[in-house]
Swiss-Prot record:
Gene3D superfamilies: Methylglyoxal synthase-like domain. GO terms for molecular function: methylglyoxal synthase activity. It comes from Alkaliphilus metalliredigens (strain QYMF). GO terms for biological process: methylglyoxal biosynthetic process. The gene is mgsA. Its EC number is 4.2.3.3. The active site is at residue 60. SUPFAM superfamilies: Methylglyoxal synthase-like (SSF52335). This is Methylglyoxal synthase.
Amino acid sequence: MNIALIAHDNKKKMMINFTTAYELILLNHQLYATGTTGKRIMEETNLKVTRFQSGPLGGDQQIGAEIANNRMDVVIFLRDSLTAQPHEPDIQALIRLCDVHMIPVATNIATAEILIRALERGDLDWRERVKERG
């Protein structure tokens, strides 16, 4: 499955801890991330990550395009809800696209752990059938 990993600056360490803890599960999937998040994940784990632009430079929109074209299956977006983000409209658009296209999305670590366990159990295999139908 194709998994997008995004983390605001104050959540990047949490994303590194998450990807380290679940590295064995994530190794079986194609990973995509915004620029700095992807770089940090690759520096600290053995995971291969396809990187888009940094979020404020359009990375969120690039991932949104993948969602709109049915090429993303799961989005894990560790948001810093306590800090104003200059690209907040892009963030809202990304979450809206997940809702419209029925893409499971986690915006905090608790939900991310639920999604990763569901992925491990095969609970999200229905996404493959959705992609086949196009």
